[in-house]
Amino acid sequence: MNVKLVSYTRDGEKVVAIASKMSRSRKGWDYHEKTMTDEEIEVWIRDAILHGYWSVLEHSIYTFSIEGISRVASHQLVRHRVASYTQMSHRFAKPIDEYYKPITPPSIEKRAKEIIEKAYQEAYENYFKLLQDGVPEEDARYVLPNGVNTNIVVTMNARELYNFFALRLCSRAQWEIRAIAWKMLEEVKKVHPRLFRYVGPNCIIHENFIRNEPITLDEVLQKDNIEFISQRCIEGVMRDGILKCIRNSKHVLEYLK
């Protein structure tokens, strides 16, 4: 799996901060662009996110190239509908030779690797038999497994990314889409750390709505003295188990090593 941020709004943090401030100011864009300091950028981003004023996040756009994932994962991705997608077509880009690398889930890798490898190989052979019999590519691909590898270009704004991360960083998310989410988060934090400082699974998002001082995902991952106020997360995990649950979620990246 390879996840790469290929394009983004360069001044996204400042754009979001100015938009947030302009909603409460009589002055226009030019004034705020000239006068806004780095400290103000952080203040206005924090204010918007922690008060649920997420519409301003929509002004910053991010495009990712996500390669070497299964069709199972890509079908989950496109359920996030406030986004744009362009996926590799198995009609025009036939999955042959080195381009046929179906994804094997870790649970099967440990228990039934031979079974899935045999099924993948049989599907591959049947695909070619259909092509040789004159079946069109768009119909022959019906025998390909859900695990067949694919590439996809994904564009989301920062608000949709917050919603995406809230769902897909959660340990209850399926392992592959969860790994994609963690890798996407790594990419956006490289370029806009202030904008994505308060991102996290839903347990962190909802926790910060009721705290006087917000917590960050980095703090939860690195510090053992973090205590949650919420009695339980929206997935039903009790307060004492939330910290461990979040940390377990990121362990999915170890499958990819």
From Swiss-Prot:
Q: Where is the active site?
A: 168
Transferase as UniProt keyword: yes
Residues that coordinate or bind dUMP = 76-79, 87-91, 141, 168
| Residues that hold FAD according to the record | 55, 79-81, 87, 157-159, 163
Question: Which keywords describe this protein according to UniProt?
Answer: FAD, Flavoprotein, Methyltransferase, NADP, Nucleotide biosynthesis, Transferase
UniProt GO MF annotations: flavin adenine dinucleotide binding; NADPH binding; thymidylate synthase (FAD) activity; thymidylate synthase activity
Domain of life, per lineage: Archaea
Q: Please state every residue range assigned to the domain named ThyX.
A: 1-202
Keyword match Flavoprotein: yes
* SUPFAM superfamilies, per database record: Thymidylate synthase-complementing protein Thy1 (SSF69796)
Q: Which residues constitute the signal peptide according to the record?
A: none
Q: Which cofactor does it need?
A: FAD
Enzyme Commission code(s) on record: 2.1.1.148
Which residue ranges does the UniProt annotation give for the motif ThyX motif? 79-89
- Role this protein plays: Catalyzes the reductive methylation of 2'-deoxyuridine-5'-monophosphate (dUMP) to 2'-deoxythymidine-5'-monophosphate (dTMP) while utilizing 5,10-methylenetetrahydrofolate (mTHF) as the methyl donor, and NADPH and FADH(2) as the reductant.
Note the NCBIfam families from the entry.
thyX
Subunit annotation: Homotetramer.
Family classification? Belongs to the thymidylate synthase ThyX family.
Question: What is the name of this protein?
Answer: Flavin-dependent thymidylate synthase
Give the organism the record lists.
Answer: Sulfurisphaera tokodaii (strain DSM 16993 / JCM 10545 / NBRC 100140 / 7)
> What phylogenetic lineage does the species belong to?
Archaea, Thermoproteota, Thermoprotei, Sulfolobales, Sulfolobaceae
